[in-house]
Structures are given as C-alpha cells and as structure tokens.
Amino acid sequence: MNLSATLLLAFGMSMDAFAASIGKGATLHKPKFSEALRTGLIFGVIEAITPLVGWLLGLLATQFVLTWNHWIAFVLLVFLGGRMIIEGVRGCEEASEKIRRHSFWLLVTTAFATSLDAMAVGVGLAFLQVDIIKTALAIGCATLIMSTLGMMVGRFIGPLLGKRAEILGGVVLIGIGCQILWSHFAG
C-alpha cells in the first residue's frame, strides 16, 4: 500500500474518534489543551493497537471477527451514548456548573468502541502486502490529531449548547453505533 493510500485509510479510520471527541469536548467545561491531548493520546494509542489485533486475528479467525465486531461496537456505543444522555438530563436538572474530566476508563471504552472498525480493517490487511506496523502507526497518529482537534472543536460548541451538550454527545455516540451496524447490514 502506498503512502497516499495509507494516509487516506488512516484519516478515514479516525473519523469516528473525531466525532466522538467533539461530543466529549462539548460535555466538558472548556477543556484545556492538555485534556484534549490526553483524549487524543488515548484514542490514538487504542486506534493504533486495534488494527494490529485485527491483523493477528485475521491470520487466525477471520470469520468470527467479521461476524461479531459490528455488534460489539454497536452495544458499547449505545451503552455509552445512553449513559451520556441520562447524565445530560440529570445535569439539566442541576443548577451547579462544575469543572469535570472524563475518566480514563470512560475514554478507553469509547476509544475501543470507535476503533472496532479499525480492527476489522486490520483483519482485511492480513490478506494484503502491507507493512502493518507503519499502517497502524499512521492510523494512531491520524486519530491522535483528529481526536485532539475534535475535543477543541467541542470546547467551542459546548458553551453554545450548555448542559444539552452531553445529551448531544450521547446522541452522536448512538448514531455512530447505528451507522456501524447499518453499514454492516447494507453491505
């Protein structure tokens, strides 16, 4: 795979994480760049690891991975999105505005859920002549950049939406999950 194809793949794989990061950034009270970078690093590392795992699974058990990856992503994203919507509704009822950070495990779970498509791509890459390490690093770096940018975009959207930002973030995650499921069934 040439450099331009690798970069297109890398940035294509980062789009779900970008959308999720916008939602995450919008739910925080003006996240600092360090928080955006932390989120970008978590998303980027996980997005770099999942195609490697997919590649290894592709060598071992292609059919199982392709049968279940969309369901796993859908369930995780709907669960996380539902949780955000519930917290957003509760937040609308509370008057206090507090500075928050997303927990490490919440970010890891979200990053994993949005990176399962990269795992499926890794399965496919097992059958091609690619340098999987360089490809995985490109995907991870693109995701780090896009997730960090997404958090900063969310920083500006969040104050406009107020406490409804968390509800919107949850809807975005559920939408990503539905899109993953739809793309599997649509073909």
Swiss-Prot record:
Concerning InterPro entries, the annotation shows: Mntp/YtaF, Put_MntP
The coding gene here is: mntP
Among Pfam families, the record links this protein to: Mntp
Q: Name one GO cellular component term.
A: plasma membrane
Write the protein's name: Putative manganese efflux pump MntP
Question: HAMAP family annotated for this entry?
Answer: MntP_pump
Can you name the source organism? Answer: Cronobacter sakazakii (strain ATCC BAA-894) (Enterobacter sakazakii)
Protein's UniProt keywords contain Cell inner membrane? yes
- Classification via NCBIfam families: PRK11469.1
